[in-house]
Regions:
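Ubiquitin system architectures
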Residues: 1-155
Length: 155
């Protein structure tokens, strides 16, 4: 089977574990023996002794390996900041959806939503929203983004 492994500060890596590989063995294989394994879209880490198959991790699944069980994400827009606690395998798309929503977010109009994206604070990087929040977390299990106008390339 093929599994896409996401980790903090690294590009996505393709691994070929057996379905009988445990979450602990996968964490060991990627060089993070003390880390937790999260299936994309799940809030709770896979139990270390669970096999990938038993945990519902199938072929071509996306998992995140992280020492953090939760990431504190802050999103800044118009001199205001909203914070959320999410699992490391949460996608930036899910954070973006909360940040632009009414109630939990900044209540952007549909027109404004289509023109904005997340940008890493202190940088010009506007990462693809399919990436995991945990890829951007620091050692304190926190990540910070600005809600900005999307870069538009014309050519």
């Amino acid at each position: 089977m093929e599994v896409f492994v996401h980790m903090r500060g690294k590009d996505v890596e393709l691994h070929n574990p057996e379905p009988t590989t445990t979450a602990k063995e996968l964490a060991d294989e990627v060089g993070h023996p003390d880390a937790h394994v999260f299936l994309e879209g799940q809030d709770i880490a896979v139990k270390p002794d669970s096999t990938l198959a038993d945990a519902g991790i199938g072929d071509r699944a996306n998992v995140h390996v992280s020492v953090c069980k939760k990431i504190t994400v802050s999103v800044r827009y118009n001199q205001q900041t909203k914070s959320y606690e999410v699992p490391p395998a949460a996608t930036l798309e899910s954070v973006y959806a909360r940040a632009v929503s009414k109630g939990q977010g900044f209540d952007l109009s549909d027109a404004d939503r289509s023109q904005h994206t997340l940008q890493v604070q202190g940088a010009t990087d506007q990462p693809d929203l399919s990436r995991h929040v945990g890829e951007f977390a620091n050692e304190d299990c926190a990540a910070a983004f600005d809600l900005v106008m999307q870069d538009r390339f014309q050519g």
